């Protein structure tokens, strides 16, 4: 059976991705300013232009990070979520999910921001794809991606709600919040492709939690207004 076989998978791809991101950051950290700027513009994702990497920039941008905080925050979540997802779905599916989430998040961002000449870098879009898979396929799997041990469905919903709020209020933080949501969407599609029944159950669980939170918020607001 699929579950028995995939359960034996070790997080080798997760570890390889983390290692590659760290190595690329070391190149940026110790490179000259001119070299680093050239690297970011040639291998980062620029919606209005294609750099020296050509279409390959849809992959290379995922392995570049702006600073240590950017790197550590992404890799912390990748380690916490990635190893669990990889063990569950298998290394091959995991790798394809990761790349597909990052690539299509980049493509949609390019399509919706065609005039932007700002390079986009970072693994967040791909990582949000993995977050979606954990939310749908492993809703009750406890993860420390947000430092506190939380079920995957709670962790995923919190992050998605934060990103939705950031997009709605147009937060100007130098962060491509829209790409996080695009990556999450691709991850959801991937989860349904891997195991429709499990993903559907995970979706129902997530929707029930959101409904409960909405009812609680309405009730709580009513209590405050009455008081």
Regions found by a protein language model. Give the residues of each.
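A detector for small-residue-rich transmembrane helices and their helix-helix packing motifs
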Residues: 1-227
């Amino acid at each position: 059976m699929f579950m028995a076989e995939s359960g034996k998978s070790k997080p080798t791809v997760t570890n390889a991705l983390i290692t590659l991101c760290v190595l690329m950051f070391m190149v940026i950290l110790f490179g000259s300013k001119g070299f680093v700027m050239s690297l970011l513009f040639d291998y980062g994702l620029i919606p209005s232009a294609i750099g020296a990497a050509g279409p390959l920039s849809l992959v290379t941008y995922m392995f570049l990070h702006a600073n240590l905080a950017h790197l550590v925050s992404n890799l912390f979540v990748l380690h916490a979520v990635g190893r669990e997802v990889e063990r569950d779905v298998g290394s091959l599916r995991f790798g394809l999910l990761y790349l597909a989430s990052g690539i299509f998040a980049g493509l949609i961002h390019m399509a919706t921001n065609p005039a932007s000449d700002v390079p986009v870098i970072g693994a967040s879009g791909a990582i949000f794809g993995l977050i979606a898979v954990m939310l749908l396929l492993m809703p009750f799997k406890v993860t420390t991606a947000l430092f506190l041990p939380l079920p995957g469905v709670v962790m995923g919903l919190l992050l998605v709600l934060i990103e939705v709020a950031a997009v709605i209020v147009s937060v100007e933080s130098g962060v491509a919040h829209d790409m996080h949501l695009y990556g999450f969407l691709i991850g959801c599609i991937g989860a349904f492709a891997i195991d429709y029944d499990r993903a559907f159950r995970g979706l129902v669980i997530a929707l029930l939690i959101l409904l409960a939170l909405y009812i609680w918020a309405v009730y709580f607001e009513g209590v405050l207004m009455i008081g």
